[in-house]
Design a protein with these regions (language model features):
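S-adenosylmethionine/decaboxylated-SAM
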Residues: 2-199, 203, 207, 211-217
Length: 217
């Protein structure tokens, strides 16, 4: 489910700029098409990277993924910016470390791949490392509950990311999708310092002789 209204609101500042966009989970290519039209077609130096295996997942067992992949590839072929649409037909566990090792950074990242919490968390941590300052990270399906228990949904992972990265993110929107902006890190909290108290020496209750004996080697 793609929230075009929120995208238009929070991504408009990137239009016409040489942005780098990453999508984890391309599926039919609907978001890829939107990214191409709104960003790549407006700047010859803008690039899109899409990661997907088109092999399916536990929540999608009755879908023809060959047809889904073909739909995405058809969108790429028809795009005026097709030479700057880079498809990585790999799992995110393989593709994201590859991108990270190349030092590629992104202005916009959209995560909509595996819905399993541990997978979403893995993708998000790597993506945060590739997201530029003032870049935007979008999570899809925050409120998705098709599978039980909750560890098979994105929400626990997204909640964890918002908590862990709280000092360096701004929550732009939270609904079925969550949109975060990476900002300069805020001051990290420090341990509260107690007021200095006067130290008072108290006489030991151990007899002097015993103290002396206990220290004899």
């Amino acid at each position: 489910m793609i929230g075009w209204t929120q995208w238009d609101k929070h991504l408009s500042e990137f239009k016409g700029k040489p942005v780098h966009i990453l999508e984890v989970g391309v599926y039919t290519g609907a978001a890829m098409e939107k990214f191409a039209e709104c960003f790549l077609d407006l700047n010859p130096n803008a690039h899109y990277y899409g990661v997907d295996t088109w092999e399916g997942s536990p929540e999608y067992t009755d879908i023809d993924f060959k047809a889904i992949e073909k739909a995405a590839m058809d969108i790429k072929k028809k795009s005026p910016s097709k030479s700057r649409i880079h498809i990585m037909k790999k799992s995110s566990a393989v593709a994201l470390p590859m991108l990270l090792s190349k030092g590629i950074t992104f202005d916009i990242i959209f995560i909509d791949a595996s819905h399993v919490a541990k997978d979403v968390l893995f993708d998000a941590v790597l993506c945060m490392n590739m997201l530029k300052e003032n870049g935007v990270l979008i999570f899809d399906d925050y409120l998705w509950t098709k599978l039980k228990p909750a560890i098979f949904t994105p929400k626990p992972a997204i909640d964890s990311i918002m908590k862990i990265y709280e000092p360096e993110i701004e929550v732009l929107y939270s609904g079925y999708q969550v949109i975060l902006k990476k900002v300069p890190p805020k001051s990290f909290p420090t341990k509260s310092v107690e007021k200095t108290r006067k130290k008072t020496r108290t006489k030991s209750t151990v007899p002097d002789k015993m103290q002396s004996d206990s220290m004899t080697i």
